[in-house]
Amino acid sequence: VTTRQALVAIGAARHLDADLVLDLGDLHPAQHGALQLALELDDDVIVGADARVGLLHRSAEKLFEARDYRQILMLANRHDWLSAFSSELGVALTIEAAMGIVPPERATWSRTLLAEVNRITASLLLVGAAVPEAAQILGVREELQELQERATGGRVHPMITRIGGLARPLDARWLDDLARVLALLTDRLPAVGEAVTTAMQAYAGCAVLTTDDALSIGVSGPVARASGVDLDLRRDAALLAYPELASLIDVPVSVAGDIPARYEVLLGQIPVSITLACASADRLRALGEGPVNVPLPKVVRVPESTSYGEFEGPLGRSGYLLSSIGEKTPWRLKLRTPSFTNVQALARSLPGTPIAALAPSVTSFFFVVGDIDR
């Protein structure tokens, strides 16, 4: 059997040597960065694949070692700009656990609400960039982005998270506007979901990730759940206010592991997040006024320790290994990011896939390039 090699460029990697440039459109986050795929082809079928990362290294982990803990929260959302709030929140939760800090109840519910809004906006971009018919949903996403900007001051990088809570509360008018936008999204989502599902059925059986491969690689989030791995930290761990919302957490799972299954799971988690966000907003209204952070010393020092924290972000499970020697900066803060494993899973799933299905295969693994090379 005679095979040939092909180097595929994604995003800014098109400026390097390449045999094929894969254009995913201006909207898809995988296009914002640089990634190469080294493919082995037999006629028009992929028989081998290797993801070449390292072209957009964010140096986040090294920068953390030279920043104090407050400054780290301002940097923590830079490597995955799609899951920005969840990224800074995961770091804050890890620091708080190491210091024994318990945020106020209003802060916990506000964080839960913002985390679900972040999950919705991330999912909507991945859905809206999938097929042209789904782009109409991006108008609703734009309204959610404007609400985030009103609440945090940052459209892309919220930077509202503080050690022990949030920088400012979410006011009643903001909660009312959020309810209006979520109602609009609930109304428009079924038609968009149908358009995406119909378009992706053409790729049934392509880029299949088996359950065993998903487990061995350590994939999480919607990619893992589309391969039969029923894991979700919101349901399985006592994080934020999720234990009180347990009855509302319906985790969509599929066993097919192919392109349509991944989009099915991604679409399925949006209504769940809408329900959780609405429930969190109702609870905040019931709580009324109250503090959203705790007093901190001028210099924050984490006691000498090694600790590990996790959070379920829009793309999957993020892990934070914090090693402190009692100084105002960490000795090491290592990130375990979902995009890194998702790209490894992409390479594992491609053999047997027609080259014509490469673009939807890549977009169905839901990654941000900066989150790979952090």
Model-derived regions, located:
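Active-site bordering "gate/hinge" segments
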Residues: 1-374
